[in-house]
Amino acid sequence: GDVYQGLEFEKLSKKEINFAQKHLRILSGLYGVLKPLDIISPYRLEMGTKISFAKNKDLYSFWKDEITNHLNKDLKSSSILVNLASVEYFSSVNTEKLNSRVINPVFKDFKNGQYKIISFYAKKARGLMAKFLIENRARSSEDLYKFNLDGYKFSKKESTEDSPVFLRK
């Protein structure tokens, strides 16, 4: 998809791939939480798919505790989670039980005289940010603000502490 086009995982160095393996997690409707090098079978199952089984009315309720616990375990060495997932997928995380600060970057493009979130570009920008954080081995929220790929620039004026905004003309 668009996020993975921005990530360009195939162009990362071996060191960058190792960093991604330690720090990047991918949310999946079928597998829950994945690392970049996990081997999976091809599938098409969106997190928002209406499917009920056992005591679960949907995939969100099925995965919520497991994904949250998995992330908490992986976040023991970090106090920050940079959320680059869509709203749909991140809804599978119980943020109230997450043991870290969540930073939700926002990407806006200039169109018709104003900045707005354009879904197609925002998806690709999330992948670009993941690539940037991996290539720069980001360790702090300040590292995030240096993101400048594909014409995006951090806007302190538009941002809040947990929702940095990146604008592109």
Model-derived features: positions:
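Internal, well-folded beta-alpha domain core
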Residues: 9-160, 167-169
